[in-house]
């Protein structure tokens, strides 16, 4: 009987997993040539989004401006946090990457995934990518799972669609995938044969994570995967993501409204507001030296900051109302809520400015 292959990267006995190493660099630290560095950078670029716009038609000539020129990249093995409040465009971005937007959506821009513009692919070609090369972990696992099918069969079905395997092997792989995410057989119960309503919220989330990982995709999009979970279960799921990250080269876009979830987890963070990336930086720099006024306000709002407040002092909030997606502004979208705005912020839109090699901010305060 065939033993089900593990979901983790295949390594020779005694070999150590190696990620993000530059070809030409020896174990003894010999420096590579500039050509090798450039070749590695091109090879490591997995996803590149350039000037992505998404608008929805609402009838009567009205439009909703959901994404307004997003540019973003993700390299192989990198965890990129997508941070923003409700309505900032996070979930629209996830659906745009998978081409799952409704027919009312008008999409423009460029999405390069492993060198191919996914916006120009046929639906048949896109079906070969969804679930196999790019996988989605939704924020509502209870709605994503089919209530009348066994959990294991739903994971196995992903393999049946994308692999030329018989059903027996698909089931064996699915069982292995469930075990990888902590849904272990035993105690008189097999999670493979359970139905969604028989699982807790955390177990359902583990099941959809198994669905996403079973084909070993190059890119995983986690759309607020802990939003519907209690605090204890949320911590368990985050620990699971950290464990799964070790030993695999998949890239992860982790979408959240909570900056604390990205701490000690993400490599880089892109902060979204009104359908635009307003700041990108390393996760350490995000907590130590945030620049954009919206990003600073968002960090000040998280519950973890409550411990720093004096007795009777109120938790910080961002004043004003979020930007109206149906009414695009002439200037900076955050200007009506910004305490640091300049006169030109009302009438001109800042450009993204590189602060250094790892950081960029869209704000006139930094030369935008």
What residue spans do the PLM features occupy?
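Conserved ABC ATPase signature
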Residues: 190, 194-199, 203
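A short, proline-enriched helix->beta-strand linker immediately N-terminal to the Walker B motif
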Residues: 214-218
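Conserved ABC transporter NBD signature motif
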Residues: 106-117
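Charged, flexible cofactor/metal-binding loops and thiol motifs
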Residues: 1-40, 188-189, 282-368
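Conserved ABC ATPase "signature" region
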Residues: 117, 169-190, 299-300
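P-loop NTP-binding/switch modules centered on Walker-like glycine-rich loops
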Residues: 13, 229-310
């Amino acid at each position: 009987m065939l033993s089900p292959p593990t979901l983790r990267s295949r390594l020779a006995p005694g070999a150590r997993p190696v990620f993000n190493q530059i070809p030409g660099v020896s174990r003894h630290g010999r420096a590579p040539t500039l050509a090798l560095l450039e070749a590695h950078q091109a090879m490591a670029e997995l996803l590149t989004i350039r000037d992505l716009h998404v608008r929805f038609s609402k009838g009567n000539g009205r439009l909703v401006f959901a994404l307004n020129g997003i540019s973003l990249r993700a390299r192989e093995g990198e965890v990129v946090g997508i941070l923003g409040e409700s309505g900032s465009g996070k979930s629209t971005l996830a659906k745009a990457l998978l081409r799952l937007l409704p027919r009312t959506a008008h999409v423009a821009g460029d999405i390069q995934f492993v060198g191919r513009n996914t916006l120009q692919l046929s639906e048949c070609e896109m079906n070969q990518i969804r679930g196999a090369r790019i996988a989605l972990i939704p924020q509502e696992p209870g709605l994503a799972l089919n209530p009348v099918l066994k959990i294991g069969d739903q994971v196995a079905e992903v393999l049946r669609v994308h692999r030329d395997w018989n059903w027996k092997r698909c089931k064996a792989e699915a069982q292995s995938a469930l075990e990888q995410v902590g849904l272990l057989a035993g105690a008189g119960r097999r999670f493979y044969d359970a139905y969604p309503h028989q699982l807790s919220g955390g177990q359902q989330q583990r099941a959809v994570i198994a669905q996403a990982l079973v084909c070993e995709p190059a890119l995983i999009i986690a759309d607020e995967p802990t939003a519907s979970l209690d605090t204890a279960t949320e911590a368990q799921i985050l620990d699971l993501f950290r464990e799964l990250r070790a030993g695999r080269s998949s890239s992860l876009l982790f979408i959240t409204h909570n900056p604390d979830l990205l701490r000690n987890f993400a490599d880089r963070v892109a902060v979204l507001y009104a359908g635009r990336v307003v700041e990108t930086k390393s996760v350490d720099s995000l907590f130590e030296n945030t620049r954009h006024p919206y990003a600073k306000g968002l960090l000040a709002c998280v519950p973890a900051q409550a411990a720093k407040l004096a007795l009777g002092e109120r938790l910080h909030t961002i004043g004003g109302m979020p930007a109206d997606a149906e009414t695009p502004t002439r200037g900076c979208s955050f200007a009506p809520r910004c305490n640091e705005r300049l006169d030109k912020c009302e009438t001109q839109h800042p450009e993204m400015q590189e602060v250094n090699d790892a950081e960029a901010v869209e704000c006139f305060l930094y030369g935008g």
